């Protein structure tokens, strides 16, 4: 708000955001909400690119708007902290990158009976790509993968179109970018993010049908990326199960297929909701019984019961406290 009030311009690169991309830093550096906090600031442009070509397009546009056009906007761009291969840019994708979403990898199966659309942003886009392969190879589901570079841009565009249409009833209605991208699609829609579920929910009203939202609601934890993503239910296997569940809900496949996938992937359907697992010492008064049980089970498995970095007994004197 201070930067907006001062009419600041510029680009801020966030190297540590994302709930699951920075290993071993627990609550303090596992940010799952900064993109949500960007929503109320009108002059802040917030992007979560997955690949170098997306980042280049966003920065180039940011320099044009702030330095050339002298527009009073500033940028928050999260690049997370995970190394992975950088692909080449799909032809004609730059407009979608700047407006918030584009189709990164089509399924390649135009006549498939079972269709799905997977949406990822930042490092979680790689989980969507892995889920695309699993769905195609094991379940004959043709899934297109979409990159969402900015939930805020999509939300602001959608609400702006809604406002115009409400106040200009006799003029041609405007169509939000989300709806333009998806107007000729069918199937089910699954969105996965390294941030809270409120982000994908914020644009769901402009989808052809209600999408399934996967996110990282809850406290940050100290573990490997793969274990964190399994715990927060945003890894490729959870994306596959969410897709199969949506197909079963509309009657396209039987529910036994979903149950079989849950068992095959080693997903515990009785695991506690991640947002209820506090991560404190067993027996803490502020933990529910289910959350304590989930923490103990996960610690025994070495998987998802990850203690936060500060989950340790502090000296009685108050000296030697963690200084992180």
Where are these regions (language model features)?
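Ferredoxin-type iron-sulfur electron-transfer modules in oxidoreductases and energy-metabolism complexes
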Residues: 51
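Long, structured ligand/cofactor-binding scaffold of large enzymes
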Residues: 1-4
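Extended active-site and interfacial segments that coordinate phosphate-rich ligands
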Residues: 36
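Compositionally biased, low-complexity flexible segments
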Residues: 287-324
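Thiamine diphosphate
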Residues: 9-10, 14-16, 20-31, 39, ...
């Amino acid at each position: 708000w201070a930067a907006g009030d001062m009419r600041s311009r510029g680009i801020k690169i966030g190297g540590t955001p994302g709930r699951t991309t920075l290993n071993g830093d627990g609550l303090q550096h596992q940010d799952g909400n900064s993109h949500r906090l960007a929503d109320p600031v009108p002059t802040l442009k917030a992007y979560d690119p997955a690949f170098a070509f997306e980042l280049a397009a966003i920065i180039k546009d940011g320099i044009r708007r702030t330095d050339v056009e002298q527009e009073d906007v500033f940028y928050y761009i999260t690049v997370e902290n995970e190394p992975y291969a950088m692909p080449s840019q799909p032809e004609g994708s730059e407009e979608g990158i700047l407006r918030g979403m584009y189709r990164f990898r089509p399924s390649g199966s135009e006549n498939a009976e079972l269709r799905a659309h997977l949406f990822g942003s930042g490092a979680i886009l790689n989980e969507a790509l892995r889920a695309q392969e699993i769905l195609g190879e094991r379940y004959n589901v043709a899934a297109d993968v979409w990159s969402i570079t900015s939930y805020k841009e999509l939300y602001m565009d959608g609400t702006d179109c809604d406002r115009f249409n409400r106040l200009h009833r006799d003029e041609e209605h405007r169509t939000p970018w989300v709806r333009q991208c998806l107007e000729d699609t069918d199937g089910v829609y699954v969105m996965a993010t390294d941030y809270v579920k409120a982000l994908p929910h914020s644009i769901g009203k402009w989808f052809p049908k209600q999408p399934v939202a996967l996110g990282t609601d809850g406290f940050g934890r100290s573990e490997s990326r793969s274990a964190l993503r399994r715990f927060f239910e945003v890894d490729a296997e959870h994306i596959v199960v969410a897709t199969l569940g949506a197909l079963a809900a509309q009657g396209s496949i039987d529910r036994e297929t979903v149950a079989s996938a849950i068992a095959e992937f080693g997903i515990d359907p009785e695991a506690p909701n991640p947002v209820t697992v506090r991560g404190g010492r067993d027996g803490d008064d502020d933990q529910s019984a289910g959350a304590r049980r989930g923490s103990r089970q996960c610690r025994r498995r070495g998987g998802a019961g990850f203690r936060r970095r500060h989950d340790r007994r502090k000296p009685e004197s108050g000296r030697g406290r963690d200084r992180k």
